[in-house]
Amino acid sequence: MTSTRQFHMNDLFRFNNVNLDVLTETYNMPFYLQYMSKWPELFTVAEAPNNSIMGYMLGKSEGSDTLWHGHVSAVTVAPLYRRLGLAKTLMEDLENTSSNVYNAYFVDLFVRASNTLAISMYEKFGYVKFRRVLGYYAGDDPEDAWDMRKALRRDENKQSIIPMDRPVHPYELEW
């Protein structure tokens, strides 16, 4: 049976089966350490009965006033464990913690505009395309992103998910 728990320091040496995948964004060690120290409740792993890491969620809280929200920095599942509902479980954990612990209005995430599989998955989880962010992903292959959102209990009127009527540039993003 799969269990979820907070990410621990030693997991940094155990999650290569998840991280070394072309679909997974990877970060440097200080990035992961920052999340562990600032938002430990939003940095979780799914663990198999044999103690191998099946996937993880890297999240944080940010914003102010009605823009106070949970943010999905990364959610990824090892290829061997995909299509078992683990991403949904990890997302629900982050949503519940964002709502119950951080009292957030919504959860958001950014996804490559070309990643139709992920976009479809997030839409099945109740996320909507809030706005297109032009040139969000820089580098050798620059690409737009979708800022996708899901309203939480605190946003009774669902104001946080009313789609914008125009694309924005990264410098226009506000929290």
Task: Enumerate the predicted regions with their spans.
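Loop/turn elements at beta-strand to alpha-helix junctions within RNA-recognition modules
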Residues: A78, R112-N115
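Short acidic/glycine-enriched loop/turn segments that link adjacent beta-strands
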Residues: W39, T66, N115, G139-E143
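Conserved G/P- and acidic residue-centered "switch" motifs that form tight phosphate/ATP-binding loops
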Residues: G85
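Conserved GNAT acetyl-CoA-binding A-motif
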Residues: S98-F110, M121
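Conserved catalytic-core motifs of GNAT/GCN5-like acyltransferases
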Residues: D108-F110, E123-D147, L173
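Acetyl-CoA-dependent GNAT
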Residues: T2, M9-R82, M91-Y102, A151-D155, ...
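Short glycine/proline-centered loop/turn elements that form peptide/ligand docking sites
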Residues: M91, N115-A118, G135-D140
